[in-house]
Regions:
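Short alpha-helical segments and helix-capping/turn motifs at coil-helix boundaries
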Residues: 1-3, 82, 249-253
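Active-site neighborhoods of enzyme catalytic cores
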Residues: 1-22, 236
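Generic structural motif recognizing short loop/turn segments at the entrances and edges of beta-strands
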Residues: 2-3, 12-13, 227-229, 244, ...
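Short clusters of hydrophobic/aromatic residues that line enzyme substrate/ligand-binding pockets
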Residues: 7, 17, 80, 155, ...
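Glycine/tryptophan-enriched, flexible segments
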Residues: 12-150, 253-299
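Active-site-proximal binding-pocket segments
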Residues: 91-265
Length: 299
């Protein structure tokens, strides 16, 4: 849907996902999702007579990293709610890259996922559009917290700790595995994105904008609206965000979503050896420090 198609009755934008998604689904049920017949535009194309700018003139380098293989079938949709949070399982579609560049139709994905009894996959597509309309209506959120009071947070922004996070050397296995996957493949499992982002903002007290920028430089499926929306969600300063006192415990997250350490061992070759780094911060102390900083900012 376009930016003004799914709004409140008074024409203002939704800033909470649940009522937005309900209105979105109402609109969907009343509207037949049709494909745009792009072939009709072929007759309107024109051949340029003058030489166009060569792509080599831009500061663009070819990557040797192969994008993740698309995994979109009925089983992925049906089992998405069950499998989407387990990084060792190939339970996500990997379609983010194609949605970003328009090589897959959002309409075809909506039609296919809407046929399933399990709507979890469809809800994720709605989240994508929710963040898009937020960025449209509130463009200042590219660099500012949606909730302005969170601008008062006194970030530590320790660059040595930031570099350890970037390199996957924090001493927290699930965090390090995620960052190493990102650096090597240009992709990171969504559950692990939340864990790594939360760790940067809450454990290290590093400004979400710094982490968002790093993800933007690495992710093949980077979309500004989703990236900013999710980083602000994790930091607690965005629309419909997690409360600031929700701080992921990396060890509990690993126990829950990578109990057998399959994902961790895949990306950390030196795991469980003396070569693996010590924790750069104590979880309990980091949690207490974070809560204090946030309370001071919002009080």
């Amino acid at each position: 849907f376009e930016e003004r198609e799914v709004v409140k009755n008074d024409g203002t934008p939704y800033v909470v996902y649940t009522p937005y998604s309900k209105k979105w689904m109402e609109k969907l049920s009343k509207k037949d999702v049709k494909h745009f017949k792009s072939e009709a535009f072929l007759s309107k194309t024109k051949k340029l007579k003058k030489q166009t700018t060569n792509i080599k003139t831009f500061d663009i380098n070819e990557s040797n990293i192969k994008p993740p293989k698309v995994n979109f079938n009925n089983d992925v949709i049906k089992n998405y709610e069950r499998d989407r949070n387990t990084p060792e399982i190939d339970g996500t579609s990997k379609l983010g890259l194609h949605l970003r560049f328009g090589t897959k139709s959002i309409r075809s994905l909506v039609k296919k996922s809407n046929l399933s009894q399990n709507k979890t996959f469809l809800k994720e597509l709605i989240w994508r559009e929710f963040f898009m309309q937020i960025l449209w209506h509130f463009p200042e959120t590219t660099t500012q917290c949606f909730k302005s009071k969170y601008e008062k947070i006194k970030w530590r922004n320790n660059m040595d700790e930031f570099n350890a996070w970037c390199e996957g050397k924090t001493g927290y296995p699930i965090v390090d595995a995620g960052m190493r996957e990102l650096n090597k493949t240009g992709f990171m499992h969504n559950r692990v994105r939340m864990i790594t982002a939360s760790f940067l903002c809450k454990h290290l007290l590093i400004d979400w904008r710094i982490g968002e920028k790093y993800f933007a430089s690495k992710l093949f499926d980077y979309e500004q609206s989703s990236n900013i929306g999710n980083w602000q969600w994790v930091a607690g300063c965005g629309v419909d965000a997690a409360p600031y006192f929700r701080i992921f415990n990396p060890y509990e997250q690993q126990k829950k979503f990578d109990k057998e350490k399959v994902y961790v061992k895949k990306w950390i070759s030196e795991y469980d050896t003396t070569k693996y780094p010590q924790e750069i911060v104590n979880h309990k102390l980091a949690r207490e420090r974070c809560l204090k900083a946030y309370k001071e900012a919002v009080s």
